[in-house]
Amino acid sequence: MRQRILQLRKRIKEEKPLIHCITNPISIHDCANVILAVGARPIMAEHPAEVADITASAGALMLNLGNITDARIKSMKRSMRTAMENKIPVLLDLVGVACSDLRLDLARELLSIGHPAVLKGNMSELLAVSGLPSHAIGIDAGAQDALTAENMETVSEVLRAFSRSNQAIVLATGKQDFVTDGERVVLVQNGSAALSGITGTGCMVGALTAAFLPGCEDTITKEMTDSIETGVWSGVEMGSNGRSGNYLAAAVLGTALMGIAGEEAEKISRGPGSFQVNLLDEIYGLSDRQLLDLLKIEMY
């Protein structure tokens, strides 16, 4: 995994893929900047009349349900259809689905159109979309839904099943981030309390992960082909061009990079204003050696 994420990071810097984001106005500026910071190119088009054209030319699509509007609902549906038709990987960020029936219904409609590469949310949001009881406080996860040592086995079973049923990587954010492809589980334990002191850091994790999705395309191996032919999904999506996307590494890299950058930025920041600036600098400037040395993950 460690070598894989370094290769992925390098590939994005070299290829500079276009990442189409339909996101909320609260974090749109920050999402665009973190995509630029890792070497990809953001485009934030959201008018319903143009989004299909934009998505068709992109390397990945990010849909963020925060601060939703009628126009963005229409645009997200159109872009989701276009992405599915063109085998473009999608990250769906389930912001607020645990506190809003409008967003929950939209999330389910988008999932009925096709399978995203990554489904991202906090534990309350993922439980809500799974049809299970959740205890969100606004867009924040409720304490009762938090991942703990005591409920790890139960939560792991729920999220792995949700991953398999949606044929998507599931990324559950929290004090430790839980990433699964339905079989493998990676716990990312990097992070800083300062990240919750500014707006948009969760959205930025989604943007970072989306930026790395185009770099996950690899030539199909025999193992991947056998997995697809036998109906066993393990984070691999077959595209019409004979390529695959193994998206687990993108989700791990997106969350780890934000967590490590947060840790490093906190050390040199006086408060939330300087932290926000330093966070972007750390995402941009973190070396591969630092990334490997500071990475805290558990795999099982």
What name fits each language-model region?
Residues 1-44:
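Glycine-rich phosphate/adenosyl-contacting loop at the front of the ribokinase-like
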Residues 23-28, 193-206:
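Glycine/serine-rich anion-binding loops at beta->alpha junctions
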Residues 34-86:
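Active-site cofactor/substrate anionic-group-binding motifs, chiefly glycine-
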Residues 42, 87-91, 170:
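Hydrophobic beta-strand scaffold residues
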Residues 72-121:
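Glycine/small-residue-rich loop that forms an oxyanion/phosphate-binding "nest" at active or ligand-binding sites
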Residues 102-185, 191-194, 227, 232:
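Conserved phosphate/ATP/ADP-binding segment of small-molecule kinases
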Residues 128, 199-242, 251-256:
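Short, small-residue alpha-helix embedded
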Residues 223-236, 259-300:
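Charged C-terminal helix
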